[in-house]
Curated annotation (Swiss-Prot):
It is found in: Plastid, Chloroplast thylakoid membrane. This is Photosystem I assembly protein Ycf3. TPR repeats lie at residues 35-68, 72-105, 120-153. GO terms for cellular component: chloroplast thylakoid membrane. Essential for the assembly of the photosystem I (PSI) complex. May act as a chaperone-like factor to guide the assembly of the PSI subunits. One of its GO terms (biological process) is photosynthesis. Keywords: Chloroplast, Membrane, Photosynthesis, Plastid, Repeat, Thylakoid, TPR repeat. Belongs to the Ycf3 family. It is a peripheral membrane protein. The keyword Ribonucleoprotein does not apply.
Amino acid sequence: MPRSQKNDNFIDKTFTIVADILLRIIPTTQREKEAFTYYRDGMSAQSEGEYAEALQNYYEAMRLEIDPYDRSYILYNIGLIHTSNGEHAKALEYYFQALERNPSLPQAFNNMAVICHYRGEQAIQQGDPEASETWFDQAAEYWKQAILLAPSNYIEAHNWLKMTGRF
């Protein structure tokens, strides 16, 4: 039984019903429908912390999905899982791939900035101020991109940029 048919959460059930209706009425190919089903199941598994299952669904969705915009969100979600697992280098790769297909994803820029900022903090703890400045500068560049795309979001990042003289 597909994951989408065994959701217990009301919001998930509602989303699934609406998505199923849309898939029936909007003219799409069978391949697009399958890709969306895997994507939806991946989101459901991800929201429940079932990251291995989510990744399997996302990889299957990537195999089927041909639209670059839709692929960008699949790649972004794969990046989120790697971020959650502490696999920052992999996460950055997936965020980059998502942005190659859709440069208007402020959340990808934000997450890349957060990873770079974290690495800057780690460099400070390891006594490497040069590396920390490099990481912080990179974080600043990503946050500037995120803020450019979504000016009313990322207030804390905006404040950090001002406080550190990077804005």
